[in-house]
């Protein structure tokens, strides 16, 4: 029942919907959610391709290098720390599983393949999302709500070229480099755990890596992380760029919610795309 005031100043009770409306409510919610999701997907895709077309320019190289330092170089410490202990834990768990079958000689290949094909790309992307992706969203979001982006329009400076495209290109360059660091340090962590602490023969560990890891595995890992780089950079830039258009909040609160949405959505899409890309590469 809804309370409605008529044109003569009185009021009346009017029944809106009924049992049929209650039945249709779940379908309405699902339909609206799907439509909003498809709309945002299309808008983000257009946003990505528009930003990429604005990449080339004389002044862009400096900004790309600046973003590579911000996204890549400043993330290397946390990447090395996480990868070292990931490799050590993986080596420890794998050793105790393999020793039951007398196959501890395969420890090197198991650790290296797990890192190169799965854990390296995925964990690298998630860690960069947490450290740099959230900061990118907050930075662009603050520039939006403080009308700095509007000022760029006034000065006839394209905001996508100035703010967005350097970040996307820098992410595409930085993610594979950091993944290579993650893989290498993780394999060293597995060596420390398996060889130094558990007594696996060092030659057997290294020979196992050489025998079972080939170039195709490495390339597949880099393909994955490039896909992750495009997803993370696009989502984080898009959420920040359109933070002022959020329906659930405005101002500083909108920036905070946009940052949270960017990190959560990026992590979910990393895992979803990991399955999709893996199924295509196998």
What are these regions (language model features)?
Residues 15-64, 244-249:
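Short, membrane-interfacial amphipathic segments enriched in basic
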Residues 93-116, 185-226, 230, 234-254, ...:
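Membrane-interfacial helix-loop-helix connectors in multipass membrane proteins
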């Amino acid at each position: 029942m809804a309370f409605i005031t008529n044109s003569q100043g009185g009021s009346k009770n009017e029944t809106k919907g009924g049992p049929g409306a209650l039945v249709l409510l779940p379908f309405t919610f699902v339909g609206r959610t799907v439509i909003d999701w498809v709309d945002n997907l299309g808008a983000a895709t257009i946003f990505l391709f528009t930003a990429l077309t604005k990449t080339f320019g004389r002044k862009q190289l400096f900004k790309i290098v600046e973003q590579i330092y911000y996204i890549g170089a400043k993330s290397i410490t946390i990447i090395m720390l996480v990868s070292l202990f990931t490799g050590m834990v993986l080596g420890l768990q794998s050793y105790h599983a393999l020793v039951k079958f007398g196959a501890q000689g395969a420890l090197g290949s198991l650790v290296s393949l797990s890192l190169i094909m799965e854990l390296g790309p995925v964990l690298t992307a998630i860690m960069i999302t947490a450290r740099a992706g959230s900061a990118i969203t907050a930075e662009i979001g603050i520039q939006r709500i403080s009308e700095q982006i509007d000022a760029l329009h006034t000065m006839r400076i394209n905001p996508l070229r100035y703010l967005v495209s350097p970040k996307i290109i820098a992410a595409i360059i930085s993610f594979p480099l950091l993944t290579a660091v993650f893989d290498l340090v993780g394999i060293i962590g597995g060596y420390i755990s398996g060889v130094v602490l558990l007594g696996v023969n060092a030659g057997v560990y290294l020979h196992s890596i050489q025998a079972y890891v080939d170039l195709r595995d490495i390339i597949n890992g880099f393909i994955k992380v490039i896909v992750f780089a495009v997803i993370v950079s696009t989502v984080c830039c898009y959420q920040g760029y359109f933070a002022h258009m959020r329906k659930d909040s405005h101002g500083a609160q909108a920036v905070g919610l946009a940052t949270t949405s960017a990190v959560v959505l990026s992590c979910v899409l990393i895992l979803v795309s990991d399955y999709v890309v893996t199924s295509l590469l196998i």
